[in-house]
Amino acid sequence: RLVYWSHWITPAFESRRFDTRFFALTVPPDQEASVDRGELTHHAWLAEADICSHLASGEMKMAPPTRATLQDLWSSHRRHGGLAAMLEAERTRIVPPILPKRAEVGATEVEIVLPWDEQYLQIPSDGCRTLASYPDHLLAMPSRMRFPRLR
C-alpha cells in the first residue's frame, strides 16, 4: 500500500525550485535501492537513531523537507505501534502543500518558517495560502527549523 505522506514546495529564495511529494510504503526485506547520480547521489537503509546521530554530528546533510518528513514518519510509526498499523491509519491523511519561508536570524543562522507558524503571514515572500487549521500531524511538528547560514 502506497500512502501519500507530504507535499513540499521549494521557497522562492532557492535558485532551484521543486514541487515535491513524499510517499510511505512497505518494501520487500531484500529490496535493493539505486540512485540516479543526479538528484540522488547516495542512499542508505538506516535506523532513526543512526540518522539522528549522523545529522547531529554533521556527517550527513539533509534538506529541510526530507528531515521534517522523516520526523513525521517516525512520530507516526511510534504513535501507531508499527509500519502496517501506521500505513493503515494514515491512508486518508490530509496533505496540504507546505511552502516554507526564510526568516533571518543573524550572521550565522537562518530559520525556515512553516505555514502553521503564527508569524508566517508577516514574513515577506511568496508563501502559500494558509489554511484555517492544519492537520494534527503537522501541528505536532515544530513550525521553525534553524540551520547554519551557507556561505
Where are these regions (language model features)?
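Active-site segment of metal-dependent pyrophosphate-handling enzymes
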Residues: R1-Q31, T66-T69, E90-K101
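NUDIX/MutT-family hydrolases
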Residues: R1-W8, T20-V27, A33-M60
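Intrinsic disorder/low-complexity segments enriched in polar/charged and small flexible residues
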Residues: H7-T10, A47, S76, E118
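Short helix/loop capping segments that flank catalytic or ligand/cofactor-binding pockets
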Residues: F13, E32-S34, L121-I123
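Short, surface-exposed linear patches
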Residues: T26, W45-E48, T66-A68, Y134-H137
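Generic detection of long, well-ordered alpha-helical segments
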Residues: E59-R67
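Core RNA-modification/binding signature centered on pseudouridine synthases
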Residues: P64, Q71-L73, R78-R151
